[in-house]
Structure formats: structure tokens, C-alpha cells
């Protein structure tokens, strides 16, 4: 004879109205949100009746189990975060950072033109499309040395260099 009594504690019934996947990478050196902020997001979700699950890049196939996606990793177009955002949007989920925002915000040329068009003060800016001597002379005349060079799709200080001389400028543009 078997005992009909349940030998384990039954799971608490879920009363969450929504389930949100929060994409994180615990190995990231400079994440957009630290561990304390992630805990606060989870607590705030609980107070609103939203279950927040931290997921990693290995959860791509399970993304459809959720109502929304909140990306708390550094995003880039050639990164799994962009693929997650696209899939979530295609599945009709609420997505923060959505693919369109990732596309726009990772493009410094787009952002610089947008700010200038809307009257937002920005440092003197020039876009470089070649590394020939004529271009180098134009940059020095227009912006003066020293200057800061940035790649158009870098983030968190990656792809940034300060140049003080014409030689450093030429070497950085040719690198």
C-alpha cells in the first residue's frame, strides 16, 4: 500500500501576473547594473506582481516562456544581447532594450547627429572616413590637438584613444 500523503512541501501557487526574464552576465566586468541593483529590480517586480528571473545567454530557447525581457548586460549589434532582443520582439514580448534602441544607441554617429539636430550641446565632433594626410590635416585644423578618437560602435571606453600629436593621430587612424 502506498501512502497518499505528499512527501514534499507543495509549491506555492504563483500569483504573479507576469513573468519577466532579466538577461544578465555575472562575468561581465562593467555591467550596466550591479548585484544590488539586480536584487532591487527583483524585489520591485515582486511588489508589482511580476516574477523576475535572472537568465543567461544559455536561456535563448526558453525566452518564449516569459512575458517580457529586461536586458541588464552591455549590448552590441554583434552580441547575443541583440539576438535576444530581436527574438523577444518577434515573439511579441515587451523588451527593454529593444533592438531598435540597441541599433541607435550603439551608433555614435547617429547619436551625435541626433543631438546636434535637437540642439543638445555636444563637444566639437567630426566623422572620419579615411586616414590620408588631407583628412588628418583637416581634423587638426577643425578640432585642434589634443583630441579624443572614438570608434562609432564602442562602449564603456572601449575603442577610445587620446592623441596629442599628428603622428599619434595618424597611427590611431591607421590602426
Language model segments and positions:
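ATP-binding N-terminal substructure of ATP-dependent carboxylate-amine bond-forming enzymes
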Residues: 1-101, 110, 131-134
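Active-site nucleotide/adenylate-binding loops and adjacent lid/helix of ATP-dependent enzymes
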Residues: 1, 13, 17-24, 86-92, ...
